[in-house]
Amino acid sequence: MAKTYIFGHKNPDTDAISSAIIMADFEQQTGNAEATAYRLGEVGPETQYALDHFNVTAPELLNDDLADQNVILVDHNEFQQSADSIADAAVQHVVDHHRIANFETAAPLYYRAEPVGCTATILYKMYKERGFEIKPEIAGLMISAIISDSLLFKSPTCTEQDVQAAEALKSIANVDLESYGLEMLKAGASTKDKSVSDILSMDAKSFNMGDFVTRIGQVNTVDIDEVFARQEELEKEMLEVSANEKYDLFVLVVTDIINSDSKILVVGAEKDKVGVAFNVTLDNNTAFLPGVVSRKKQVVPQITEALTK
């Protein structure tokens, strides 16, 4: 049987890494012994905390050419967020919880997308539907992904299905959701030792919005001011990256995981449209967005609408 490559998006977060591992386990239980998890970037400290806690090894970094290779995508579908050779791959499955855009295949495929807070929640449902065993480490990764994507159930993207999945899994993983979740989020929230490049790339995605290409990065922190103390450096790097990658707009969303608010930093020719999107006036390229924590639900749709009016 040919190998099946399974991976999440570039600049992977906890859901992207965890869901690749989980999906590989799921596929192996179906009899696909060659299903193998990979990653499209470095493992962040939050994700590493989860992997270490449940004694799971991170997937290998994908360097292979995927031309004519069997592929399963998790936690994304847009080709610009995927492997560089994805257009030449044979995409077999997609399991995702995001919008569908810039995606097409030459052949039919299994596609499962649900409006829930986390890909791991969908995978949990798939295990239950098939009656597959959920091992403790798999349960732990599912919980970690759900907590990460939902900011410990505070994000507006979090659904009752996400909460129910985490509650059902906690006894298998042997964790207290609140205490484990807070420690995991804190592990990824410090920016003191991160370079400007790290901050901008650790959880960044590119989006085609009408005629514009927009880069939106997000960093979770317990101290927004700590990040914005380096605003000048951040802006310089954002402008350089935008020039090199031809981004029309670069938005950095700095999210306070304790108070559930965000402050944004915006550069690019279309930056005034961001002010329109959130009904705010940018002050020194920044704006405070109370209650905004979700890129998927509270940032991407709003900016898309402003850019495509």
Swiss-Prot record:
It catalyses: diphosphate + H2O = 2 phosphate + H(+). It is found in: Cytoplasm. Its cofactor is Mn(2+). It comes from the Bacteria. GO terms for molecular function: inorganic diphosphate phosphatase activity; manganese ion binding. Mn(2+) 2 binds at residues 15, 75, 97, 149. Keywords: Cytoplasm, Hydrolase, Manganese, Metal-binding. InterPro entries: DDH_dom (IPR001667), DHH_sf (IPR038763), DHHA2 (IPR004097), DHHA2_dom_sf (IPR038222), Mn-dep_inorganic_PyrPase (IPR022934). Its main location: cytoplasm. The keyword Manganese applies. This is Probable manganese-dependent inorganic pyrophosphatase. Binds 2 manganese ions per subunit. It comes from Staphylococcus saprophyticus subsp. saprophyticus (strain ATCC 15305 / DSM 20229 / NCIMB 8711 / NCTC 7292 / S-41).
